[in-house]
Amino acid sequence: MVSHLFLVQRSEVRILVGQPYMNNLLDRIFFRSRNLDYINQNLINLTNQTPANKIFEALNTYSDNSEVRYVGGCIRKIIKKETVDDIDLATNLTPSEVCDALKKKDIKFYETGVEHGTITAIIDEYKYEITSLSKDVTTDGRHAKVEFSLDWKEDAARRDFSINSIYSDKEGNLFDPFNGKKDLESGSINFIGEAENRIKEDYLRILRYVRFFLMPHRLHLVLNLLLDQYHQRFLFL
């Protein structure tokens, strides 16, 4: 029963209660649509306007099931409408398969950290880190022993923060199992899983948390907090 939301006057329907809510809802829907179009188009541009398209071709055509996606900083920066200065990729191929795929397309590469599944491809002096999907087998607070995986969500689950677990194919279709885009747009930094457990797995994660928290667009929050604390202390002198 929603008749209480409307008043009929001279054949005109006017929303009395609920108009601000509906307007806000529609604004959010259209904003998300426009924003998603912007993200999709810029990820497509990133593929078409950089040598990354050669890596996508090499890895996506390696086998019937092979796939490579953008991950990490390049997606964060596109969502935040910042300049992309590096490109990281994730793939369901093993490191040896990545090397084989790159060789077949005459793409130069070197093994950056093959024990953790990372190969660096070099095209026109640009470097692209390609990391195989994996899951942690054991951790000691700094180093992790990993096992390669075919599961994208399993790979996402081992990452530190939701904003680092956003993937995209070359067409700009996002895979975001932990709502990292939403957190990024709202300025939230959330650990994946229990924060205490994630920090125990790798103690450097707390430093990365601080680094993300102190990004330029958040500095005013820190300054306001410090000023507020100073003001409170001054009042009690």
Give the ranges of each region predicted by the language model:
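Compositionally biased non-globular segments, especially hydrophobic aliphatic-rich helices
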Residues: 2-5, 225
